[in-house]
Amino acid sequence: MQKKALVVIDIQNDITKNYKEVIGNINAAIDWAKAHEIHVVYIRHENLSAGTRTFKPNTRGAELAPDMKIVSDNIFTKSKENALTSEAFATFVRANAIDEFYIAGADAVACVKSTVFNMRAANYGVHVLSDCITSYDKRKIDEMLRYYESKGCDIIPLENL
């Protein structure tokens, strides 16, 4: 395996229905990563706040979306926006000497944003797959792509992989 990972963030049953518009591209990115011996990682969000209505642990809403291809057991859970706050994921990154990431998933203005910001702050190479991310507010995606680029991320459409 290469020292690279495709990280699919929060494509779960409770995420915005807008994910259905990019799930085909996300699945194509998963196929690409597998074909190129790139680790495929799935990040799940669990909301630990009292009284939460979404992403509750051990509920259908917290499960990965059924129309997403699952090609590895690299499934990590986080309770904060930044995927690197998952100790299990951070350990996986270190154990596999991963230094370059391809990012897909949701939400572009929250968990994707926090994850790519913190990956760049840690000097990792980060490539955001522009047609593999979504948001509750799709109008903000272009703004987020500019933000990611301003932080040193490469912005690439799936067809340019």
Put a short name on every predicted segment.
Residues 12, 46-47, 107, 133:
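Catalytic metal-binding/acid-base residues of hydrolase active sites
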